[in-house]
């Protein structure tokens, strides 16, 4: 599971394509360790201050000295959607929700899901179970909702 949180932002001066050393929270924000948690994965953006280089991906937060963010999977970047070889200078590193991962309600109030849905509990009060990869619902439970 990927963790996300509002107002998580730090800076880094790390160069290259490896794990990023985090330099502390920007004013008014919290650190990745505080906002996401040690060992958790999150969506991130690294953006070069005053430049065009950027990377959006999935990474893992580590509580260390200094705290780090590993760059596990790149979703998009200024380097043809590959790891960016960041040059010297300060970069902003922040938690984000990539557009490609967002679930959006369209103008007709529909939500289209392109893959699997994991439900724990009920949907509109109906218990749902899966068996052999097929969605099944108790017939008597459905009949009870008709009256």
Identify the function of each model-found stretch.
Residues 79, 87, 129, 135-136:
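Generic alpha-helical propensity signal that fires on short helical segments
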Residues 140-147:
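Conserved small/polar residues in nucleotide/adenosyl-binding loops
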Residues 101-123, 128-135, 142:
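Low-complexity, small-hydrophobic/phenylalanine-enriched stretches
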């Amino acid at each position: 599971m990927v963790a996300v949180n509002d107002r998580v932002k730090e800076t880094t001066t790390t160069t290259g394509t490896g794990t990023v050393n985090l330099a502390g929270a920007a004013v008014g924000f919290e650190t990745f360790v505080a906002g996401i948690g040690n060992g958790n994965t999150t969506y991130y953006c690294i953006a070069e201050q005053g430049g065009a280089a950027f990377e959006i991906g999935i990474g893992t937060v580590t509580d260390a000295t200094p705290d780090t963010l590993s760059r596990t999977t790149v979703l998009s970047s200024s380097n043809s959607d590959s790891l960016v070889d960041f040059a010297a200078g300060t970069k902003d590193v922040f938690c984000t929700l990539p557009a490609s991962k967002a679930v959006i309600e369209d103008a007709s109030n529909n939500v289209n899901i392109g893959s699997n849905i994991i439900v724990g509990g009920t949907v509109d009060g109906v218990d749902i179970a899966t068996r052999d990869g097929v969605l099944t619902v108790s017939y008597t439970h459905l009949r009870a909702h008709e009256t």
